[in-house]
Amino acid sequence: MFVVSEMADFIKAGGLGDVAAALPRALRHRYDVRVLIPGYRAVLARAGKVEIVGRVLAHAALPACDIGRIVQSDGLPIYILLSKELFERDGSPYVSTSGSEFEDNAIRFATLSHAAAQIAAGRAGLGWRPRLLHLNDWPCALAAAYVRWSGGTTPCLLTIHNLAYQGLVPYSMAAALGIPAERVSELEFYGQMSFLRGGIVHADHVNTVSVSYAQQITGPAQGCGLDRLLAGRAAKGALSGIVNGIDASWDPRTDEYLDSHFSVNHWQGRQANAAQVRKAFGLRESTGPLFAVVSRLVHQKGLDLICEVAPQIVAAGGQIAVIGGGEPEIEQQVAELTRRYPGQVGAFIGFEEGLARRMFAGADFLLMPSRFEPCGLSQMYAQRFGCLPIAHATGGLIDTVDDGVTGFLFQQASAEALRRCLERAFRTFRLPSLLSAMRRAAMLRPSGWDVAGKKYISLYERTAATAPAVATVS
């Protein structure tokens, strides 16, 4: 059972939602995969008629909840954890419409985790038990602990999509969350409790969304205070990485958001898309390179570095189109660039799916100087559409961008390193045959979920074989 706090079919706050929509479907040819997700207002609005099929009992301060069931049009079964009190509210899965975290997030997601453990134990009245729990990020991580604390043996795989988010709560909430007093130390994190730490301790296997990120989080620079614990899991062969895939709908030959389609053998549509992007962002007609930024406008994504090198890009004849939202200070810096370089730098503060896809389909290069990146999806979307990533060599960017072949990598997260990498990109742009060869290589790079799915099948079997009571995944 795939346990998740967001799913793009219903509600999405980040890349996890895309993974939750794609990976279970990629595995259905092999397993009876079912998804468990909270019954947010947005989920219920899109679910249609929900059949009540089970119930989980209250535990400490965690309320009893009904379990609803729907079946997607492609046959994927979805279990929905129903609670008006906890989940039926406006906002994203984690924050209110004002942008502040819900104060009861610990109760909300402990309830989700406990429900998963109860389903695994066959105590929810479903008439079905999963042979493995696949848990995703801190909102679901505590399920592995609940399983073990109750004496359960269901194999648990925990996937870390971003280690920076750990689900930190005060010790004073231990009793309310149903955490045994003698077990609190297993969640200890610098004077607080961490849901994610509990999952790392108790899951049979932990994986991340890229091979390089799995290696990097075992060191202090990117371990977010959990590096020693993760290094210990790695030493026992219980930490690995699998690069995410991207959905098959990202196809420049058929994408519904594109007016002009193209392929590796017929490039003409890219020029038409570039013209559309320039018009949408108020950029002048140009024969120079077009650089896209499709990102949250936050420090982690290196947007301050882009703002620092923007004058050099413009001076060299390039143009920049930015879409995204985030930290007010960086939004203001981007707005200032558009005022300083009218017709050369344009921005859309917010997000619009169709516009983002047209940017990938029309821009020559994608700027992605992330300081850390567990996997990253934008670089793979860009490659699929023949837009070459210019990326900092970290995490999943190392695993997905072949320097000088399917994009460009720079080693240090600094403006100077980015400038030197941009010089390489400009030289490539002036060599049409090399540019075309790199675009072709990028578009042909295997990045579908079929590749990642096969690796998850192997990981499921390995996780089941090393669990306390050996189980066969089915």
Swiss-Prot record:
ADP-alpha-D-glucose binds at residue 12. GO terms for biological process: glycogen biosynthetic process. Its EC number is 2.4.1.21. Pfam families: Glyco_transf_5 (PF08323), Glycos_transf_1 (PF00534). It catalyses: [(1->4)-alpha-D-glucosyl](n) + ADP-alpha-D-glucose = [(1->4)-alpha-D-glucosyl](n+1) + ADP + H(+). It comes from the Bacteria. GO terms for molecular function: alpha-1,4-glucan glucosyltransferase (ADP-glucose donor) activity; alpha-1,4-glucan glucosyltransferase (UDP-glucose donor) activity. Pathway: Glycan biosynthesis; glycogen biosynthesis. Keywords: Glycogen biosynthesis, Glycosyltransferase, Transferase. Gene3D superfamilies: Glycogen Phosphorylase B (3.40.50.2000). CDD domains: GT5_Glycogen_synthase_DULL1-like. Belongs to the glycosyltransferase 1 family. Bacterial/plant glycogen synthase subfamily. Synthesizes alpha-1,4-glucan chains using ADP-glucose. This is Glycogen synthase. It comes from Xanthomonas campestris pv. campestris (strain ATCC 33913 / DSM 3586 / NCPPB 528 / LMG 568 / P 25).
